[in-house]
Amino acid sequence: MNQQDLNQIKARGISEQQIEHQLEQIKNGFPFLKLEAAAAIGMGIMAPTDDEVKNYEQAWNEYKAEGHKIVKFVPASGAASRMFKNMFAFLSAPYDVPTTDFEKHFFENIKKFAFREALCEKCRENEGKGIKKLMGEGNYKAVVANLLEAKGLNYGQLPKGLLLFHEYSADEVRTPMEEHLVEAALYASSNGEANVHFTVSHDHLDLFKQKVAEKADFYAEKFGVKYNISFSEQKPSTDTIAANPDNTPFRNEDGSLLFRPGGHGALIQNLNEIDADVVFVKNIDNVVPDRLKADTVTYKQVIAGILVTLQKKAFEYLNLLDSGFYNHEKLEEIIRFVQRDLCCRRADIKELEDAELVIYLRKKLNRPMRVCGVVKNVGEPGGGPFLTYNNDGTVSLQILESSQIDTNNEEYMKMFTQGTHFNPVDLVCATKNYKGEPFNLPDYVDPTTGFISSKSKNGKDLKALELPGLWNGAMSDWNTVFVEVPLSTFNPVKTVNDLLRDQHQAVIGGVKHEGGWCCKH
């Protein structure tokens, strides 16, 4: 490391020791986790009955009525560029008319996209013609260029949260960011206020603030709430150093070190700064129009009701342990709660003396808690719910990505491929202890659960270090409970054509416009 390197490291708020440790991790890799089983209904996954659904909804509404602070936390830094990979490919293709199935589907259904009118305006502005005429002349690439490039809507560079997703009428077309504001009013508001926090990239912060300034009052009036909307950026101190294939630091063409964002696991630092009793976490692109929100609202309240019910019990037990007024029978009751309700087991628990048992139970009860919605596996990419062995020998529930599983272990691969459920990033978190003090969330990260990915820059291969994922290793030492939620609550948008699914059509049959489906010219 030369002086320029050290200055670069210091400017990011990273220590030299951290860099050395990161390079060591890149060199040695990370251990695979030891698995006991894939979680399933009755084995780590709750499936509430209709009566239980009502009871948990009621528990959540009672909790809200007590005036607790609730925050909806939305990771929203993702750029939309990957959504349009196929359309970028069309722009650079040697042909000019839709050829692949994806391209044909896009153009045949262009009238169904919520951004259609805005795109038509840009086409008229830049080409002197609307979408219909351009397509009629075979000028399909002009339409796509106006969608993706800076001269047009610039969707190739915008964050996903600011794209037009759902069209309700000619005057109301919503972005995912707006849909999250609506959701916050419907299940995450208390005392007439809805707190929403978006994590965004630095380049997009002003755009998000501008959209909030334009829209927040409209939704506040519509739903009768006061919005408190805040933003944060991923901290430069969570960036990780890139390495060459020989594990030496990768350097840019000017000789400087290359740092890369550490992945969504870096957001544990942002989550740690949220002052709230309960925090909902959900990805920016998993939203539906109002006509399909009922299931989402119901099951968000259910998982939140389960969280506060379990937390209340854990707090009662911690206060009891503090008081000293308990007998062995009471300790056995607490063991049952930890094992059955919190799904955390220890093989040698019967061998512990009461004094050791109290230390163990206190440690397991007094930590952050999360309840995660999981949906039936339908082949979508995503983390799976597993029972895994922890560093202290206990077995508990974790959300694992494929990179954390030893693909050479046939038994583990069978668990992964035959797992009945997966996690669509649907979490509700309790981040304060039984004394009302916030937990320091970085203390509960398992640093051995990062992973190394292969990337390239300027045609040169490099190794990138990803931090433990936010809902994976970053929450490894939390109490975790899984609850089955309907598949209807999971509607991510990974490609632009996903917006053509019925689940993303705000009005069945589409919004009729003057002059037909497309814009007027």
Listing of model-derived features with the role each one plays in the protein:
Residues 1-24:
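Intrinsically disordered, low-structural-confidence terminal and linker regions
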Residues 193, 368, 381, 422-424, ...:
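A general secondary-structure signal for short beta-strands and their flanking turns/coil
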Residues 181-185, 409-412, 467:
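Short amphipathic beta-strand starts and helix->beta connectors
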Residues 133-137, 151, 155, 285-287, ...:
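Conserved catalytic alpha/beta cores of large enzymes that bind or transform nucleotide phosphates
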Residues 7-9, 13, 28-31, 35-378, ...:
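Domain-scale recognition of functional cores that engage charged ligands
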Residues 407-410, 432:
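Long insertion/accessory domains within large nucleic-acid-processing enzymes
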Residues 1, 222, 520-521:
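Polar low-complexity intrinsically disordered regions
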